[in-house]
Amino acid sequence: MENSKLLKEIDFTSLNVDYADIRIEKTDETKIVYQSGDLREATTSPSLGAFLRVLKDGNWAFKSTTELNSLQSEFEALEGRVSLLPAKSKLSWPKRDSQHYEVMRYQDKSCNKASLKEKKDFCEALLPTLESEELIQGPMVIYKDQYKEKWFMSSDGVSYHYDYNHAGAYAIFTLKDGDQIYEDSVKYFFQNVHGQSKSAITELEKAIEKAKPFIHAPTVEPGKYKVVLDSEITGIFTHESFGHKSEADFMLGDEAMKEEWQIGKSVGSENLSIVDDGNWPETSGDLPVDDEGNLKTKTYLIKNGKLAGRLHSTQTAVLLDEVPTGNARAMNFQYEPIVRMTNTYIEKGEKSLEELISQIDDGLYIVGAKHGMGMSTFTIAPSKAYKILNGKLCGPVKVSVISGNVFETLNLIEEVGNDFHIASSSLGGCGKMEQFPLPVADGGPSFIVKEMTVS
């Protein structure tokens, strides 16, 4: 039976609960891996299932299932389970107007429009470039895509049907000359492989040439430097060091954190604004409506240097007496929704990258990120770095890690550029409470930090 019809057969009025909802997800995923020219994996993974929740007297009961022909009886079983629990303080679920959201954007251009052979052909088109370079060892190409349809209905009359789509690949390689090595990668993101091969090859060729000078580049002298961070580093910094601390569930029961993160507190320069916004179609953080049926809002976490908001599910908003922001997300139908980011970024400023670099007499330009982590303090492993002298780039240097304290770094941001970019990925994602990988995106412009620890 069609999934929308399955939802219409559910009778929430027969349940003696305060609130109930159901989310059905149908997902198709493809993963392809080539290692040193050999095909190691080529799999397609379809799934269909539902996640059901009921709330009564402050207690939740929930279940995931792939049996979609007995949803009413599943709800009745959940009602029986939750009724056995001792009542807690009643959670005042906010009242919403009945509303249906239909947001189908990708049916005509989804990754499913390409065959498995076409996806393998895209990967194989990259292999000659990797294999013809004598300095490259152990090259790998990883392709992954996902097309997902979601249906939702709640006992307070909210429903939706929307789709999500992304595709992309990593070309990963190690350059080795004597005992010197340098690891690099090229990341691709698109909606469908059709017509992508030619530009992907050109991008890979340029990336290999750009990486070669780093094989024998000198290692940076550890210390504190004035730095320009590019848009990819900006995104990692924003997500890892600030975005997670803006997720409101971290504040529940933590009075010290509530005090530290009071709305209106000055935390950075006036030219700094940080946003979480799911309304960016064709990004990996695309989210028109969350897994509780709340529209995703553009949420300012920092506006003009001051704490302006935080990310909420319905429950965290109720408990902190704030407003839901549409950030309740689950990785798939097997998980409950929790507070997660979407597209998290720093808004652009006015100066070009060239103008930012020209302002630095002695410093570093940090480009790209291999990985990063952090809460109150952060560490990021950059992909590349260049020495800046007298306002000009002066050659590559090897940098292992940049690090700092979040609030100190926010206050040390001097200038924000206008070269805005959001970085999406079809591989990896964000991990939280065993829900990994959840698709997100992050970015912003380049910006100057007055002082940062570099090693």
Role assignments for model-derived ranges:
Residues M1-S455:
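N-terminal small-residue-enriched
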